[in-house]
From Swiss-Prot:
Residues noted as binding [4Fe-4S] cluster 2 in the record, renumbered to the chain: 196, 252, 401
Protein source organism: Nematostella vectensis (Starlet sea anemone)
Protein name: Probable cytosolic Fe-S cluster assembly factor v1g210509
Molecular-function annotations in GO: 4 iron, 4 sulfur cluster binding; metal ion binding
GO CC field: cytosolic [4Fe-4S] assembly targeting complex
């Protein structure tokens, strides 16, 4: 798994990649042993473990250094590369620990105290799995449901409803902000889309209080799903939030950082809205290890937290990939604020393909100006314009990765699988073949 753990680390020719700080501000404490002196060598054993060889020929096994995601968030070093350190709380291993514990409790006759294990699958991950195994969207979802339930998972959900909710609230939030801007409150715009954890880390660590008021306050679909599972589902099945173990399957590794934030921690029950995030790549590894004949597995319908479709088929939205925020909010705001119906957005590429803008004109006057800024090079330019009061935009969709979710389209295939793929990503490409399109994570 380590070789696949960060898609970003596998890419080349990336000119705005931010490397970690030279010195970690949360270093591992080294215990000095009495009598230790002289030089020592470190050797890697055949099983991959590290041992220290002293001058007198002695050998001692070295303890592996560990760091939690909360430590990562407190560090001033890496931004999008935090997953390159050893993560102990957000991995498939943690899920298997819970499932193993549940099996032991059931054997001991204590099944009533086992954790209720819930998995929520994002449309992008579902689409990547469908493409990987040459399945339709619906078949991939049902086979994933069957696979996870064979492992011992109790509920498997789709996150479409949470995405609908997040999108609708983002639309309303922008209209509120724009109307306040029209009344003279210039601090309300531009509204910056905030579902990208890498961007959020950068904004908080680098620009702090200055930039935060511009960032949308709407929860991401992942965290909305977390609230629904830990509050609504838990109450429906008669469980407390801390007795529910919630896992989200996401295409973006930085969603692990988002789930680990203290903002989404319930102090009363000492639990997080999302206990664990596993990436699409990790799910593929799980399938290879536990269900090599994945295509032959008997399908099982996904569970329905809220019913999105009577037929059970998935539905989506136009504006797939990274463009979900911008396109839907632009169309909604055009209709709500100016009574203008916009069917197709015409983008204008500025300095590079990762910085595009779209404008609504009424009577020859620009009344709405939106932009999409992907990658830290463009983000830094945007922030500098904001600080100088030179930003002309009312809304900006921000993604830390260059090309937005094009990064995530390569999570199972590598950068050469779709070499000419546009930023709308593999997810939209695959889903539209099945009559479905998606928005954001």
């Amino acid at each position: 798994m380590a070789a696949h753990f960060s898609g970003a680390l596998q890419l080349t020719n990336l000119d705005d990649f931010i490397t970690p700080s030279q010195e970690c501000i949360k270093p591992v404490k080294i215990e000095k042993k009495p009598g230790a002196k002289g030089l020592a060598k470190i050797k890697i054993e055949s099983d991959g473990s590290y041992v220290q060889l002293s001058e007198d020929g002695g050998k001692s096994k070295l303890q592996k250094a560990e760091i939690t995601l909360n430590d990562c968030l407190a560090c001033s070093g890496c931004i999008t590369t935090a997953e390159s350190v050893l993560i102990t709380q957000q991995s498939q291993d943690e899920l298997f620990k819970i499932l193993d514990s549940n099996r032991k409790l059931v054997k001991e006759g204590k099944g009533d105290v086992q954790k209720l294990v819930v998995i929520s699958i994002s449309p992008q991950s579902r689409a990547s799995i469908a493409a990987k195994f040459n399945l339709t969207i619906n078949d991939a979802a049902k086979k994933l449901s069957a696979f996870f339930k064979q492992l011992g998972v109790h509920y498997v959900f789709d996150t479409t409803f949470a995405r609908d909710f997040s999108l609708a609230e983002s639309q309303r939030e922008f209209v509120r902000r724009f109307r306040a801007y029209q009344q003279g409150d210039e601090g309300c715009t531009p509204m910056l889309a905030s579902a990208c954890p890498g961007w959020m880390c950068y904004a908080e660590k680098t620009h702090g209080d200055y930039i935060l008021p511009y960032i949308s306050s709407t929860k991401s679909p992942q965290q909305i799903m977390g609230s629904l599972v830990k509050d609504h589902l838990a109450s429906v099945v008669g469980k407390s939030p801390d007795s529910v173990y919630h896992v989200c399957v996401m295409p973006c590794f930085d969603k692990k950082l988002e789930a680990s934030r203290d903002d989404f921690y319930n102090d009363m029950y000492s639990t997080r809205d999302v206990d664990c995030v596993i990436s699409t790549v990790e799910v593929e590894t799980m399938i290879q290890d536990h269900c090599p004949d994945f295509n032959s597995i008997d399908p099982v319908e996904l569970d329905k937290l809220y019913c999105s479709s009577d037929s059970g088929d998935f539905f989506g939205h136009s504006g797939g990939g990274s463009g979900g925020f911008l396109e839907h909010i632009f169309k909604y705001a055009s209709r709500e604020l100016f009574d203008e119906k916009v069917d197709v957005l015409t983008y204008k590429t500025l300095r590079n393909k990762d910085f595009r803008e779209v404008t609504l004109q009424v009577d020859g006057k620009d009344v709405l100006k939106f932009a999409a800024a992907y990658g830290f090079r463009n983000i830094q330019n945007l922030v500098q314009k904001l600080k100088r009061g030179k930003s002309p935009y009312h809304f900006v969709e921000v993604m830390a990765c260059p090309s937005g979710l094009k990064f995530l389209a390569q999570d199972l295939f590598g950068p050469t699988f779709y070499p000419t793929l546009e930023p709308r990503s593999l997810e939209k490409n695959v889903q539209q073949k099945n009559g479905v399109s998606c928005i954001f994570i």
